[in-house]
Amino acid sequence: MPCSTEAMEKAGHGHASTPRKRSLSNSSFRLRSESLNTLRLRRIFDLFDKNSDGIITVDELSRALNLLGLETDLSELESTVKSFTREGNIGLQFEDFISLHQSLNDSYFAYGGEDEDDNEEDMRKSILSQEEADSFGGFKVFDEDGDGYISARELQMVLGKLGFSEGSEIDRVEKMIVSVDSNRDGRVDFFEFKDMMRSVLVRSS
């Protein structure tokens, strides 16, 4: 498949300058990595899912790969996505995305020999706008355990430290999470965090 998934987190939401195109045959990126656990795959999936509807379409995947500077054949990409797409769907759900990753040959994926956490940070920086990069810095402050999500307790603790009235009661914090929790998992990812903070700042202004 014409893409790179360890580098996949470079794509998704945000904007970046057009990178130099590289052919996959000469690429140092690989698409298969035993070290990519479900949590990291979820982050990649969420970055690719530009409209946050829980499905990665061919267009979203193509856009992500283009931001990575990877040349893709649209017909081949469509064929690959279709082979993992459930009947009646228009793209890949997260479980389909995991199946795609598991099916790939070990000769693909990841930066060889480099620190994966550093790679992940570099990828995000390369695709996020300055506003989003600033927001991500704030997100990391809230995400105290570094799992890529903000729990109600984490949110309450930081809001309290910042002096927001929302941090005074856990019930209010939980309502804030529910209001932006588009995938209903009871916690806040980066893109949900941006929406939540916008609403907090509007109410506080």
Swiss-Prot record:
GO terms for molecular function: calcium ion binding. Ca(2+) 2 binds at D143, D145, D147, Y149, E154. Residues 1-26 are annotated as: Disordered. Residues 36-71, 72-107, 130-165, 168-203 form the EF-hand domain. Keywords: Allergen, Calcium, Metal-binding, Repeat. Pfam families: EF-hand_7. Ca(2+) 3 binds at D181, N183, D185, R187, E192. InterPro entries: Centrin_CML-like, EF-hand-dom_pair, EF_Hand_1_Ca_BS, EF_hand_dom. Ca(2+) 1 binds at D49, N51, D53, E60. Could be involved in calcium metabolism in pollen. Binds 3 calcium ions. This is Calcium-binding allergen Bet v 3. It comes from Betula pendula.
